[in-house]
Amino acid sequence: MLRTIVVFAPIIAALAWVVFNIQKPAREQFNRDFLGKD
Protein backbone atom coordinates (compact mmCIF):
# COMPACT_ATOMS: atom_id res chain seq x y z
CA MET A 1 0.00 0.00 0.00
CA LEU A 2 2.71 2.44 1.01
CA ARG A 3 4.77 1.52 -2.03
CA THR A 4 1.74 2.21 -4.24
CA ILE A 5 1.41 5.68 -2.73
CA VAL A 6 5.13 6.32 -3.20
CA VAL A 7 4.86 5.28 -6.85
CA PHE A 8 1.65 7.13 -7.70
CA ALA A 9 2.17 10.33 -5.71
CA PRO A 10 4.71 11.79 -8.22
CA ILE A 11 2.53 10.70 -11.15
CA ILE A 12 -0.56 12.33 -9.66
CA ALA A 13 1.45 15.45 -8.84
CA ALA A 14 2.72 15.65 -12.42
CA LEU A 15 -0.79 15.15 -13.81
CA ALA A 16 -2.13 17.83 -11.47
CA TRP A 17 0.64 20.21 -12.61
CA VAL A 18 -0.17 19.54 -16.26
CA VAL A 19 -3.90 20.03 -15.71
CA PHE A 20 -3.18 23.22 -13.77
CA ASN A 21 -1.05 24.61 -16.61
CA ILE A 22 -3.60 23.62 -19.24
CA GLN A 23 -6.12 26.01 -17.65
CA LYS A 24 -5.00 28.57 -20.24
CA PRO A 25 -5.71 29.20 -23.94
CA ALA A 26 -3.88 25.93 -24.53
CA ARG A 27 -6.91 24.14 -23.12
CA GLU A 28 -9.02 25.29 -26.06
CA GLN A 29 -6.47 23.81 -28.45
CA PHE A 30 -6.43 20.64 -26.34
CA ASN A 31 -10.22 20.39 -26.46
CA ARG A 32 -10.22 21.03 -30.21
CA ASP A 33 -7.67 18.27 -30.83
CA PHE A 34 -9.16 15.85 -28.32
CA LEU A 35 -12.91 16.36 -28.56
CA GLY A 36 -12.98 17.27 -32.25
CA LYS A 37 -11.28 14.08 -33.37
CA ASP A 38 -14.36 12.22 -34.51
UniProtKB/Swiss-Prot annotation:
Subcellular location, principal: membrane
Subunit structure: PSII is composed of 1 copy each of membrane proteins PsbA, PsbB, PsbC, PsbD, PsbE, PsbF, PsbH, PsbI, PsbJ, PsbK, PsbL, PsbM, PsbT, PsbX, PsbY, Psb30/Ycf12, peripheral proteins PsbO, CyanoQ (PsbQ), PsbU, PsbV and a large number of cofactors. It forms dimeric complexes.
Encoding gene (name): psbY
Keyword hit for Membrane: yes
GO terms (BP aspect): photosynthesis
InterPro entries attached to this UniProt entry: PSII_PsbY
Protein name (record): Photosystem II reaction center protein Y
Role description: Loosely associated component of the core of photosystem II (PSII), it is not always seen in crystals. PSII is a light-driven water plastoquinone oxidoreductase, using light energy to abstract electrons from H(2)O, generating a proton gradient subsequently used for ATP formation.
Location in the cell: Cellular thylakoid membrane
Transmembrane portions of the chain: 4-22
Membrane topology, from the record: Single-pass membrane protein
Tagged with keyword DNA repair: no
Source organism (scientific name): Prochlorococcus marinus (strain MIT 9215)
A Pfam family it matches: PsbY
Superkingdom to which the source organism belongs: Bacteria
Disulfide bridges in this chain: none
Annotated family: Belongs to the PsbY family.
Gene Ontology MF, one: manganese ion binding
Keywords recorded for this protein, A-Z: Membrane, Photosynthesis, Photosystem II, Thylakoid, Transmembrane, Transmembrane helix
GO cellular component: photosystem II; plasma membrane-derived thylakoid membrane
